[in-house]
């Protein structure tokens, strides 16, 4: 493209140009442009207007590149500042969150201790109530066992008395039955003896 603009030969050699970096496009200064133009005329066999055009084009290109680089550097500096500010803000936010977490953790810990103490009191109260209930139940059970034992002993005595009465009644009935049997036997013997005497008397009368 450069060859088409200034009508340059097919191959030319150029030397690098030193420059100073400023803060914007207007402050970029490239020294010794006339020296480079003279070198192009002497060594490159360019005409003066061609050398001037080449130097101006190269100067504009270098200034544009320097301006672009300076803008990138400025953006990078702004990004660095922004990154630093974000780190600072993040550190503040982290400190605030940590402080809030500590405060919340402290509150939760206090609530936990309060609930723990309440549960301990409730457990002790329940233990006392259970102990009292068990003691009352054991006392009632012991009294009930004693009452049942007394009633059982009383029932045993009544059963023994009834058994004794039954045995006495059975013995009396046996004695009465034996007495009746004896009387019946005596009566039968008397009847048989009388009958036998009557038969003998009747037989004597017949003879």
Curated annotation (Swiss-Prot):
Keywords: Coiled coil, Membrane, Mitochondrion, Transit peptide, Transmembrane, Transmembrane helix. One of its GO terms (cellular component) is mitochondrion. It comes from the Eukaryota. The chain crosses the membrane at residues 184-206. It is a single-pass membrane protein. InterPro entries: CCDC90-like (IPR024461). Belongs to the CCDC90 family. This is Protein FMP32, mitochondrial. The gene is FMP32.
């Amino acid at each position: 493209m450069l060859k088409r603009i200034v009508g340059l030969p097919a191959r030319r050699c150029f030397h690098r140009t030193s420059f100073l970096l400023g803060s914007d496009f207007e402050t970029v200064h490239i020294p010794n442009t006339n020296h480079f133009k003279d070198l192009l005329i002497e060594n490159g066999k360019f005409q003066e207007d061609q050398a001037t055009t080449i130097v101006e084009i190269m100067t504009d290109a270098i200034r544009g590149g320097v301006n672009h680089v300076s803008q990138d550097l400025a953006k990078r500096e702004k990004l660095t500042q922004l990154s630093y500010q974000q780190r600072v803000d993040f550190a503040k936010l982290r400190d605030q969150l940590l402080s809030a977490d500590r405060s919340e953790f402290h509150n939760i810990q206090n609530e936990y201790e309060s609930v723990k103490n309440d549960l301990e009191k409730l457990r002790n109260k329940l233990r006392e109530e259970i102990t009292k209930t068990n003691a009352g139940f054991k006392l009632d059970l012991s009294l009930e066992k004693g009452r049942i034992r007394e009633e059982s002993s009383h029932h045993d005595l009544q059963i023994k008395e009834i058994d004794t009465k039954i045995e006495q009644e059975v013995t009396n009935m046996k004695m009465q039955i034996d007495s009746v049997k004896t009387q019946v036997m005596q009566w039968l013997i008397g009847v048989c003896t009388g009958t036998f005497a009557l038969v003998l008397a009747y037989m004597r009368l017949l003879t």
